Amino acid sequence: MMATIPVLKVIIAGDGNVGKTSLIRRYCEGKFEQSRVATIGVDFQTKLVKLDQGEVKLSIWDMAGQERFQVMREGFYRGSLAAALVYDLTEPTSLEHLVKWRKEIRKVIPDLPMVVVANKRDLAPEHPMKHGRMLADKIRTSHLATSALTGEGVADMFRHLAELAVSKRRSS
């Protein structure tokens, strides 16, 4: 009898145009598309991930960043085991808004493990990430840097999310 592969739901949240969909596509499909189409509501993809604990299937939920989708998003947070709060290194307000995103998610799942992700590293290679690190320290989580364009840090980010999700599932 084959063992069932656990499905772990994770969410990718942040303002519009920070690169959430691009990160997911880079990870799941291995590609980057220059053209941007805003996510309407939510979207999701799945990917098998091999961890030290065994294989898991990540169900990666892409949350639309526009304010008008807030009420809808809250329903989709349920059942999540981890979240990435993504900001654009070239857009400081997207980092400031992560506080709002965290609050919105915590309203639904108070103890959800999260990671702060600085995206678009390729556009700002010398940009200091101290403010992102300060936020991550303040909320007691990790801070990672990624580039959906080059792929830098993307696999590490999703592996970290998968490990957070496995840990959360075990403690629930």
Descriptions of predicted regions:
Residues M2-A13, N17, S22-G30, Q45-S172:
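Ras-like small GTPase catalytic G-domain
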Residues S35-F44:
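Short beta-strand-centered segment that lines the nucleotide-binding/catalytic pocket of NTP-utilizing
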